[in-house]
Amino acid sequence: MNPFRWSFRAQFLLGFLACAGLLAYAIYVQLHLGLEPCPLCIFQRIAFAALAVFFLLGALHGPRAAAGRKVYGVLSFIAAGVGMGIAARHVWVQIRPKDMMSSCGPPLSFLSETMGPFEVFRTVLTGTGDCGNIDWRFLGLSMPMWSMVWFVGLALWALYAGFKVRRSSVHH
């Protein structure tokens, strides 16, 4: 079974399942391995959740028209692009020299109680400290690096599924 030959619905369902699996693993790591997510990790989770929603909506709707598939492909690509940006920022924070580190600041729950949403977003994206800690690695890559890999892969998958020319079932 070649997933590149699957229907749009099946391809978008696979994208949804990938996002759901990644979110489930993040929750497992938090609850069972005791790794608390930093604010940038939480924003990456939100981006994966938004991407999952677009993949699921596309899979459930399964538009027949090419324009509809392209819309879902672009929306998913945008969600993945936002996630890529957040993950890239997180990777940058992690690879900075130690002497450039500063505190990440208060927890996200405190920030959301004391600031407006745009201030929270700006504060989190300029934070460093705890966000710079690398507590988990797999094959030499940190979790934000793996998030970046997944965001890139899912962005390309969304574009492929959304823009793939599909043969009509009607023969001329």
UniProtKB/Swiss-Prot annotation:
Q: What cystine linkages occur within this chain?
A: C38-C41, C104-C131
Which loops or segments lie on the Periplasmic side of the membrane, by the record? 29-46, 89-145
How does this protein sit in the membrane?
Answer: Multi-pass membrane protein
Query: Keyword annotations for this protein?
Result: Cell inner membrane, Cell membrane, Chaperone, Disulfide bond, Electron transport, Membrane, Oxidoreductase, Redox-active center, Transmembrane, Transmembrane helix, Transport
Query: Its Gene Ontology molecular function terms?
Result: electron transfer activity; protein-disulfide reductase activity
Topological domains, Cytoplasmic = 1-11, 64-70, 165-172
Q: Name one GO cellular component term.
A: plasma membrane
Its chief place of residence is membrane
Q: Which residues form a coiled coil?
A: none
Q: Name one Pfam family in it.
A: DsbB
Q: Keyword Transmembrane, does the record have it?
A: yes
Q: Which InterPro entries match?
A: DiS_bond_form_DsbB/BdbC, Disulphide_bond_form_DsbB, DsbB, DsbB-like_sf
Family as reported in the entry's similarity comment: Belongs to the DsbB family.
| HAMAP family in UniProt | DsbB (MF_00286)
Q: What is this protein called?
A: Disulfide bond formation protein B
Q: Which species is this UniProt entry from?
A: Xanthomonas axonopodis pv. citri (strain 306)
